[in-house]
UniProtKB/Swiss-Prot annotation:
It catalyses: UTP + L-glutamine + ATP + H2O = CTP + L-glutamate + ADP + phosphate + 2 H(+); L-glutamine + H2O = L-glutamate + NH4(+); UTP + NH4(+) + ATP = CTP + ADP + phosphate + 2 H(+). It is an enzyme of class 6 (ligase). Pathway: Pyrimidine metabolism; CTP biosynthesis via de novo pathway; CTP from UDP: step 2/2. The active site is at C379, H509, E511. GO terms for cellular component: cytoophidium; cytoplasm. NCBIfam families: PRK05380.1, PyrG. The gene is pyrG. It comes from Rickettsia peacockii (strain Rustic). This is CTP synthase. Keywords: ATP-binding, Glutamine amidotransferase, Ligase, Magnesium, Metal-binding, Nucleotide-binding, Pyrimidine biosynthesis.
Length: 537
């Protein structure tokens, strides 16, 4: 029988529900259990694929092409289990299905309502695709009390009644704010959060309390008394310097064992060797390397969450701290770039869409190429690298991308040439996008092949434009190596400048497949080149 665990949050958003769910999943895995983690988001968008990063942060792409919440990235990185389209749902997707079914007459003429019709769809999502797992952990987005989240809370309340405590556990994450003038953690917000949760029929079984400092036994006992939860099931969640310290912190607080005890499951020893190795490597990371990220959303780090984590994974691999320098691409010019990129050991241009800030990114790519600084271009970053090379090395001064330039030499073109711009709407945008995992063939003896130690790989994609193959010969005459292609050889996947220290651009998103215990080979090689550059300078 599958055991269901629901992770909810209160007091404030962004408390770390995703990290809590991912950490618990990993800890249960370490005891030999098979775990699946899912995210239920209450917003009305069908998925985050067309949402502004300022609204949502990174769009995380799964192997099967689902555009999902960045929390699924945490789930994958912590557990090593690939997520899929069945691991994420939104209110928008639920209502889309409901209204389609209503128009098809599937409700047989009854009045369609939130209860039971919306809640039934939510319950079906939670209770389906359970084969081969022991635990399903469901993170409910938002906080208790949010009006848009009520159908989700009602659905999990019903599941709780249906499955009883033998197979259903509620974990509630709250904040204990520290008031410096009073020199104490305040419990009142947690009381109100638990009260609000109980008001909709859910009594938390485990209360996880986020705080910036240690929670005393007296404070835990007080929380237990006022929230009517046994003190044993009040779990501290103290701020950590690095997110990869969180799972072991939860293990040390006994969260995994408390879950097993609640379900009356025999407590087994945990195999946490690889996580202790990560912690030791983090402790031993005394040297640092400075990486500049040339970004459009330089103030919103969550827009590049997986890139940041993938860089950290490579840092863990080499026992180096990654010192990220965020550069606003919009303000980068030929005049200030020397000052902006002073003492930088590597330059990374991440993926993105749209014309804004592209000029600064191209200037940064030229700076990396002409100064032989390790460079890594991802997706749009690779496309801009080919434009920079065309303009400044080959001499095609009017080189452009078809994404936002009609006039000029189109170095970057649409994948689907039959799709007119007027047809690219929210309704059919996915039809024009190359999404999910695709195979890629590498050329032997190249930087990419040596990094992967294989000639056949699979990587995740999210793009609708590609390199124009008509220019392959002229690029090759100027020293550019095309080292990776799609299976049909229609799409250039990787470019290299082998005469430089390390200059690589990829059409895919390698950051989505990097793990703290298995850093991605391209990020490993990029950081290796940056470390060597640092030592030489």
């Amino acid at each position: 029988m599958v055991h269901f665990i629901f992770v909810t949050g209160g007091v404030v958003s962004s408390l770390g529900k995703g990290l809590t769910a991912a950490s618990l999943a990993m800890l249960l895995q370490a005891k030999g259990f098979r775990v699946s983690v899912r995210k239920l988001d209450p917003y009305l968008n069908i998925d985050p694929g067309t949402m502004n990063p300022h609204e949502h942060g990174e769009v995380y792409v799964t192997d099967d092409g689902a555009e999902t919440d960045l929390d699924l990235g945490h789930y994958e990185r912590f557990t090593g289990v690939s997520a899929c389209k069945f691991d994420s749902i939104t209110t928008g997707a639920i209502y889309s299905k409901l209204l389609k079914d209503e128009r098809l007459g599937n409700y047989a003429g009854v009045t369609v309502q939130v209860i039971p019709h919306v809640t039934n769809i939510i319950k079906d999502f939670i209770l389906s695709n359970t084969k081969g797992v022991d635990f399903i952990i469901c993170e409910i987005g938002g906080t208790v009390g949010d009006i848009e989240g009520l159908p989700f809370f009602e659905a999990i309340r019903q599941i709780g009644n249906q499955l009883k405590s033998e197979n259903c556990l509620f974990i509630h994450l709250t904040l204990l704010p520290y008031v410096k003038t009073a020199r104490e953690l305040k419990i009142k917000p947690t009381q109100h959060s638990v009260k609000a949760l109980r008001a909709i029929g859910i009594s938390p079984n485990i209360l996880v309390c986020r705080a910036e400092r240690n929670i005393s036994k007296g404070e835990i006992d007080k929380i237990s008394l006022l929230c009517n939860i046994e003190s044993e099931y009040v779990v501290p969640a103290i701020d950590q310097k690095n997110i990869y310290l969180v799972p072991i912190a939860y293990h040390n607080s006994g969260l995994d064992n408390k879950v097993l005890k609640f379900f009356n499951i025999n407590i087994m020893p945990s195999k946490l060797d690889k996580w202790h190795d990560i912690i030791n490597r983090l402790k031993d990371s005394n040297s640092k390397v400075r990486i500049a990220i040339i970004a459009k959303y330089h103030k919103l780090k969550d827009a590049y969450k997986s890139v940041i984590e993938a860089l950290d994974h490579a840092g863990i691999y080499y026992k180096y701290k990654i010192d990220l320098v965020w550069i606003n691409a919009e303000n980068l010019t030929e005049e200030n770039i020397n000052k902006k990129l002073l003492d930088i050991d590597g330059i990374l241009v991440p993926g993105g869409f749209g014309e804004r800030a592209t000029k600064g990114k191209i200037i940064a790519i030229k700076y990396a190429r002409t100064n032989n600084i390790p460079f890594f271009g991802i997706c749009f970053g690779m496309q801009l690298a080919t434009i920079e090379i065309a303009q400044n090395l080959i001499g095609i001064k009017d080189a452009v991308t078809e994404e936002f330039k009609v006039d000029g030499t189109k170095i970057i073109e649409k994948i689907n040439k039959n799709c007119e711009d007027s047809k690219i709407t929210i309704e059919n945008v996915k039809k024009t996008m190359r999404l999910g995992s695709y195979p890629c063939s590498l050329v032997a003896g190249t930087i990419a092949a040596n990094a992967y130690k294989s000639l056949e790989i699979n990587e995740r994609h999210r793009h609708r434009y590609k390199f124009n193959n008509e220019f392959q010969n002229i690029f090759e005459k100027h020293g550019i190596v095309f080292s990776g292609f799609s299976k049909d050889e229609e799409i250039v996947e990787i470019i290299e400048l082998p005469l430089l220290r390390w200059f690589v651009g990829v059409q895919f998103h390698p950051e989505f497949k990097s793990k703290p215990f298995e850093a991605h080979p391209l990020f490993i090689q990029f950081i290796k080149a940056a470390i060597e550059y640092n030592k030489c300078n």
